[in-house]
Amino acid sequence: MKIRNLISCALCGLTLFACSPSGGGKDREMDCFITDLMDRMTLREKLGQLNLPSGGDLVTGSVMNGELSDMIRKQEIGGFFNVKGIQKINALQHLAVEESRLKIPLLVGADVIHGYETIFPIPLALSCSWDTLAVERMARISAIEASADGINWTFSPMVDICRDARWGRIAEGNGEDPYLGSLMAKAYVRGYQGNNMQGNDEILACVKHFALYGASESGRDYNVVDMSCLRMYNEYLAPYKAAVDAGVGSVMSSFNIVDGIPATANKWLLTDLLRNEWGFGGLLVTDYNSIAEMSSHGVAPLKEASIRALQAGTDMDMVSCGFLNTLEESLKEAKVTEEQINMACRRVLEAKYKLGLFSNPYKYCDALRAKEKLYTPEHRSAARAIAAETFVLLKNDNNLLPLEQKGRIALIGPMADARNNMCGMWSMTCTPSRHGTLLEGIRSAAGDKAEILYAKGCNIYYDAETEKAATGIRPLERGDNRELLDEALRVASRSDIIVAALGECAEMSGESASRTSLEIPDAQQDLLKALVKTGKPVVLLLFTGRPLVLNWEDANVHSILNVWFGGSETGDAVADVLFGKITPSGKLTTTFPRSVGQLPLFYNHLNTGRPDPDSRMFNRYASNYLDESNEPLYPFGYGLSYTDFVYGELQISSETLPKNGELTVSVTVTNKGNYDGYETVQLYLHDIYAEIARPVKELKGFERVFLKSGESRDVKFVITEDDLKFYNSELHYVYEPGEFDVMVGPNSRDVQTKSFQAK
């Protein structure tokens, strides 16, 4: 039966009415179309729609032949992921719609996390811009490029709150704060899905990992998560809900257990909360092989795990093949119902319908777009500008930065000329050979005004095996450690200033990249100490996908600029900031600890009955450490500038917030420095007394303002009852009248405070 014949049923008004008891016209059309299609499907074909294998092993010659191709022809596959290239994807869709019985098109997914061919900064870095429009722009460009190359589904955004820098996947999220994380989640969804996925450059977003994956015990990936519902609701769930509220089309369940049950089989999480309480009606997919992994959790072998996942509300099985291979027998045994299978199948088909694949299966297979829309000058320009927004200036003694374009500048370090390591871990879809290096970017910016000297200086680690494990698929050429250091010192001796490009390489953060030590790796530490001993001014350019412990560096290096992994335009973007073309404006969205022993560490913590407000070490009978302050090295919201922003006195319109009313908080910010720049003014609240203990402060607003040198701006925030609400002990979302502190400042530590009474 031709697709156009199937569509014709949706044009019949009587049939429309019969197929859909409720909803608008578009929903009735979709319901009728899918009902008609499912009436024609066998059980095996329905189970096939629930099957999502990896196509990573497909090469050009194997697209049309082989086991997976035969499964497509038999409609035993609902979609693929990890297939790159318009020709291959076009061939796969051809198999599905031209050589199968019912001609059902495929979903084609990919981890388009922070770019496709044009790579933007890692998500943690993007969040440090505090610029939701920039994040939306990044997602829009990513969708344009991915869709031009055949992708119609991205496994992004990742919105897991993380407060433990040992966890490698902190690099993929938006930091530790649920308010900021929620705004970023919405921006990603808007960027990917655009106008409800009507255009051929708009793709299906997938919020992940639902839920709580960022709270893995010990910061170890895939590890257990165990927390109260109160903490879930107040501190971790908000960004997922924000994505749902923004209309995200799909959700990915997480690897971890929630309340003792793997998320993939957790009915309370996936049905009671996500679908019933939040109203999510889209596609729910597992993470990679997570149904099969329930066996290792000690919960169920594959057959029973598949039953439990389906009953919990899971629609699509990534890689495990449990649904396809076991549910038919489970149905015969009456352990699942046909209604449950039908509902999962319907949701997969609805996702395809909303993408427009039934109307045009080749909507995302335009070879001309693939030639015209990938890695364009416009996209590269956006990536360069956005990268510069994400860099965080952590230290700048004596205004060493920006550098003057004169004299001799020594660029030293293993990250200075590491082309494959500029983009971060989730950049497998790009072509690194055409990206510039840091060395190339700085030399291009310096031109003939300054001489740029270069030395690698050291390996990533002293030990070759440790480095091999750390660098993964992006190895760096190793040299003799002693010879590299000697060369670096010779180069440094000829220079006027030293720029050290050090830190993590790309594979040291991201999935399966947990660390117990958060210092800069050993060989690089020794290089930096040797460079400081020369007596020359030293700038540290820090490459990292997580907060690092930088106590020695903060005490001994003149300037520290955290550039994260800035994407395909890293070299030029760093040069723009290094030489003062752009003033750094990034602010941390995750706390930098003084010690791994402080972790998990976050600004919006609860107080204890014996707090230590002065954060003194060994303050007996107070909540502290014998050997370390409670305070972080760099707090949430922190970030310096080349210019000097001065805050006037905090003003509050009233000392009372009336019921159903509002209260205005304002502060005048003046740029008293010599550079134009952005400042992110931050608003925090503290509920002094409540039914349950409340955080010492919570971000409730911010404004990113651009001020020219000498310019002042009145920054205003309006506080309402909604800003005071929280989930109480019965999980009701309420606000309680009482006394509150309102705080405003450039970061979570350096704030002015006023109090008001909420009626």
Spell out what each predicted region is.
Residues M1-N5:
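Positively charged n-region of N-terminal signal peptides that target proteins for export
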Residues S8-T15:
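Bacterial N-terminal signal peptides
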Residues L16-N728, V734-S748, K754-S755, K759:
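Glycoside hydrolase catalytic-domain context in secreted enzymes
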